[in-house]
């Protein structure tokens, strides 16, 4: 008999009850570790106390990402987005707040006071904050299926250094 675990556990096929017990207890231990760890929302709440603007986390050594930051700054007349490199201490803390590993530089992240967005969702959310016509473009792009948007995003993100190069340090 095979038991299929839900997708959130990574589609494992389990062939015996002993394996099920091991998996459940391992999962329970992970929850305990998370509960006892630092509350990163509280730890980073100071980032949003005086300034409620969202923070765009980006790869500080990626030329494509630096170009994206420059583009957003040029098209954000209201200065509604703040920027932080993923490699900075503040960036690492905000990654932890978002439920991501502190060394994960695989995606742009948009951190709002109560929510975080990654990959194509982050890009669309950023587009909603900047000047016309980008909010309207984001509205239409949101109807493309998430798996298609993220597939395209991941293909560019995984090849960004090869296509656009990298710099020695963050330009901001």
UniProtKB/Swiss-Prot annotation:
Its main location: plastid. GO terms for molecular function: protein-disulfide reductase activity. One of its GO terms (cellular component) is plastoglobule. It comes from the Eukaryota. It holds the Pfam family DCC1-like. The keyword Transit peptide applies. The keyword Transit peptide applies. Residues 1-25 form a transit peptide. It is found in: Plastid, Chloroplast. Transmembrane segments: none annotated. Keywords: Chloroplast, Plastid, Transit peptide. PANTHER family: DUF393 DOMAIN-CONTAINING PROTEIN, THIOL-DISULFIDE OXIDOREDUCTASE DCC. Belongs to the DCC thiol-disulfide oxidoreductase family. This is DCC family protein At1g52590, chloroplastic.
């Amino acid at each position: 008999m095979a038991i299929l675990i839900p997708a959130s556990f990574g589609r494992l096929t389990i062939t015996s009850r002993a394996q099920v017990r091991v998996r459940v207890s391992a999962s329970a231990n992970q929850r305990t570790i998370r509960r006892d760890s630092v509350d990163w929302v509280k730890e980073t709440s100071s980032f949003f106390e005086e300034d409620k603007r969202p923070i765009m986390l980006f790869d500080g050594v990626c030329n494509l990402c630096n170009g994206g930051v420059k583009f957003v700054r040029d098209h954000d007349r209201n200065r509604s987005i703040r920027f932080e490199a993923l490699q900075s201490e503040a960036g690492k803390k905000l990654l932890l707040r978002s439920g991501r590993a502190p060394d994960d530089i695989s995606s742009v992240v948009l951190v709002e006071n109560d929510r975080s967005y990654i990959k194509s969702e982050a890009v669309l959310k950023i587009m909603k904050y900047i000047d016309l016509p980008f909010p309207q473009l984001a509205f239409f792009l949101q109807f493309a299926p998430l798996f298609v948007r993220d597939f395209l995003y991941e293909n560019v993100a995984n090849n960004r250094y090869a296509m656009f190069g990298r710099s020695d340090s963050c330009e901001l």
